[in-house]
């Protein structure tokens, strides 16, 4: 076995030990006691050597003490008898040459345990110190990075969609119409790419507020000189924002009688958040606003009615193909949620409550939204809570009831015989300006009343047919109501009979 330790010398050689040297080698053969280190030809645990006798004690892996005795040859023994500490190993050796069997009386002792513990503890202490130092430096660097990033954000304008120099993804000269046509021709059919939407949102300049409702505010803005409408949702209306964005980006959703979707984005920091929905801008405003200030001739009435039901028909119709469109019900149809274009046609807006029909699973995808529709336009099955929420056709028929009321609003503003009524909301003469569920339930469900027709309608064929049409839309029994497609075809025939091109 290798012996790489030094000696504690016997009495005969203590002087040499104090000087750091091994005892002088014997002049003749020396007999030594051997134990655990006996040569094969040894007799009675005895060995002979021309060098030294030794005794060594060492600690094994289990913590026990192992004593070994034997002979060291002259060559190299001087080095082996020197006590050189070995890291992580406790051992000690003593050598002697004074007389035969002198190692019988050698009793080396192990070095104190505290020396090793101190060394190991010192190493652990250094490792801990280094680790703490490195972690502290990293933490300081992270804090500095976060601080400068925060200051950089704070230095930006607080106006959430101020003009920024971020036109990387939209080449100069591209109009909104160009971008939308490109997205449609690309085959995705689900609107502009998200990166383009975010870029547009950043570049919009807010001009003036044009409306405010329970969901938030509507602003007129500009993007590269083009007017756009920016719907800014309250943070409490995030579900409506998400749902409306999702519906607008449904494949094959774009239609001339559905409000044109441009972009959606979320702006803000940890302390404030704003939700934007950017759409086409229509300066005539809602159908409600338009009817309050504008009277109609027969052509104008039919254009408003036909274009509105065309948008509703597109919503209600599912398209089955590799990139199909699900059938969608609006659930909050009213004159304030229909916009009037410059050309006198309508487009349907505000899809925050819309539901989709998943044809693959035959399920209704209802938004997780606490908001409900407008009580004045609610059908009887919603007011008396008899609507089957798991049957998609129930929502379609509920939309048709609401659309019947919208037809009534439009028809009242059509001039016939030089007579026209002031604009009024449905049931204006039967319920308060802000009716409760109970008010509407009593009128619509219990008394089964509907808006009344002016006497002049009976003397005008077109208005008479309109009256018949709306009655078939707001029938008490949902199954008896006309579909949007049926209403669309009827209005088309009425236009032909009046020689009116829509």
Swiss-Prot record:
Reactions it catalyzes: L-threonyl-[receptor-protein] + ATP = O-phospho-L-threonyl-[receptor-protein] + ADP + H(+); L-seryl-[receptor-protein] + ATP = O-phospho-L-seryl-[receptor-protein] + ADP + H(+)
The reply on keyword Cell membrane is yes
The gene it comes from is: BMPR1B
Query: What are the TM regions of this chain, as residue ranges?
Result: 127-148
Annotated localization: Cell membrane
UniProt topological domain (Cytoplasmic) ranges: 149-502
The UniProt record lists the GS domain at 174-203
Keyword annotations of the record: ATP-binding, Cell membrane, Chondrogenesis, Disulfide bond, Glycoprotein, Kinase, Magnesium, Manganese, Membrane, Metal-binding, Nucleotide-binding, Receptor, Serine/threonine-protein kinase, Signal, Transferase, Transmembrane, Transmembrane helix
Species of provenance: Gallus gallus (Chicken)
Name the top EC class.
Answer: transferase
Q: What is this protein called?
A: Bone morphogenetic protein receptor type-1B
Q: Could you tell me the Gene Ontology terms of the biological process aspect for this record?
A: BMP signaling pathway; cartilage condensation; cell differentiation; cellular response to growth factor stimulus; chondrocyte development; dorsal/ventral pattern formation; endochondral bone morphogenesis; limb morphogenesis
